[in-house]
Amino acid sequence: MPHSFGAYLILYIMVDLFNYTRRASSVAHIGAIDLGGDNPIRIQSMTTTNTNDTEACVRQAEEIIKAGGELVRFTTQGSREAENMKNINAGIRADGYQTPLVADVHFNPNVADVAALYCEKVRVNPGNYVDPARKFIKQEYTDEEYAHELQKIEDRFVPFLNICKEHHTAIRIGVNHGSLSDRIRNRYGDTPEGIVESCLEFLRICKKENFHDVVISIKSSNTVVMVRSMRLLVEEMEKEGMNYPLHLGVTEAGEGEDGRIKSAVGIGALLADGIGDTVRVSLSEEPAAEIPVARHLVDYIGKKKGHLMIPATACPSFDWLRPTRRETVAVGNIGGSNVPVVISNRINGESTACENKDATPDYIYIGGKMPKQFVLGQNYIVDYNVYETLNSKPETTGAKLYPIFPAMAMPLIASIKADVKFLTLQYGTPAEEYIACLKAHPEVVVICVSNHQNRLGDQRALVHEMMNAGLKNPVVFAEMYQHGKEEKSDFQLEAAADMGALMIDGLTDGIWLMNNGDIPAQTIDETAFGILQAARLRTSKTEYISCPGCGRTLYDLRETIAKIKEATKHLKGLKIGIMGCIVNGPGEMADADYGYVGAGPNRVSLYRKQVCVEKNIPQEVAVEHLLALIDSDKQ
């Protein structure tokens, strides 16, 4: 009988919502390193070179290693590539590196058998290890038929495990949302439950066979699906007496700022809850460029260790595994069913006009200082003690001003008339006082701030305290950073990581990013909107779901991404998948409007949703064909 998730219980077996501790996992021995347990969170990447080209693979692997990579993965799509891992391994060892090498296998279990002879770890994909490649067809299985399919997996997987035991080879059970088998999809749907069950089917065999050098990954280009699936996996493993180490990554994250922000939202949300033993940031860039991004994320979250305890009580109705948006009453355009708002600072009297209309903040905070010019129709937040004075000035005609109060000014809220009022609160403010205030003033939006070492736990604590009191005032999370403009990437990673769990938990009615440094205000605004889009909460631009490339990619991926972006960047709200090959292509493009997928050497197939509409187009004209397809659908 297949495993059933049955009735869901709200359990907190693995996670303290308010206090950071790293999840206790077993240890996987992978060549010269150990992964999991008390070992450092390992950083890794994957080559993009042809695995039959030994020299190129050795060179690129060593670039990754020199950048700080602790594991290096190679695509092994056939037995020839798997056999050549022997030469690649020898070349890297001859240069004095003992870094473990990982073979990435899809579709062919025989290739995994060969790779296990020459690599320290082999990744297999449950979606295509024994199950045939998905065709997105509907097929009902009886329990007996389903059990027969599971037996087929065990009959093929156990001999592979025996090879791994003999050669001291570790494995990764790597589930990709985009390559779930039709069997799983038909039984569980395209859901986190299906993703987790796909993984557990293989883990149960490992446990039964007493094979413990196992690492697990669950990846998706959808950050919400990725985080919820990994949370559910942790919970289900605990129920079944498993605690294997976890590999984190957002697949097909893209490149540049968008790729970094999307990766940080997903990976950061899990790391902040103590989940994760190794990280790969999948960027459509040079593999070595992934390493410092992953390292900064891991180090940033690691600063939470040893923080002062946050004594808080979780709201009983909150479901960490399947969170829904916290119920709030709309105050103006904040909360209720409104998309989360963006608040931004302009406190030095500078212009409040915004060049990027798609990243214009919903509210601009100006403190107590008049800007050079008020923008017609723009919402402004001003300090409560100058609100009435500024609101009466003729210069503000056509603009909308709203007061903000610090916690100590709560008694004055009733004396000032405004449709929307803002109140800054931090966990630890006397609860009786602020709860009474918020109950009396439903027009107040809470600005949740924190200077705690673990600001995620601190900010969660305030909102859970509000939920326990039955308050329905909207909450905007405000975060302060200190970075110069040369540290823009660090700012974006930290902000996305801090906001990730809060957004996926359904607690966010708005975000307010601040920086004590010279990062331009427009960059901060664009980052805020990018974070909301990465968390699937608000769309402000074209979205690109692009893979990082690997040895299977047979066209110039980065050049193609640049061409497609340049030609489609004005198509706000459109999702375009750009995939090197068909391994995850159609699946990871599940909610993409269009897809550009490698089909062979310099050949591309085009998709509308998950349906292939043009096959094997020459690469040199494929972008033009994609644009023509998009244009034809507009008509």
Where are these regions (language model features)?
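Extended, intrinsically disordered, low-complexity segments
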Residues: 296-345, 367, 378-412, 419-422, ...
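Catalytic alpha/beta core domains of metabolic enzymes, predominantly
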Residues: 140-153, 184-334, 420, 429-571, ...
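N-terminal amphipathic alpha-helix/helix-capping segment at the start of soluble metabolic enzymes
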Residues: 14-45, 161, 165, 303-350, ...
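Glycine-rich phosphate-binding active-site loops on the catalytic face of alpha/beta enzymes
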Residues: 70-71, 119-135, 273-287, 506-519, ...
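Active-site beta->alpha loop and helix N-cap motifs at the rims of alpha/beta catalytic domains
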Residues: 16, 69-201, 344-355, 360-456
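Active-site mouth loops of central-metabolism enzymes
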Residues: 40-56, 101-108, 184-196, 252-261, ...
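Conserved, mostly hydrophobic/aromatic
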Residues: 43, 104, 173, 216, ...
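Short, acidic/polar
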Residues: 52-63, 108-112, 263-267, 350-356, ...
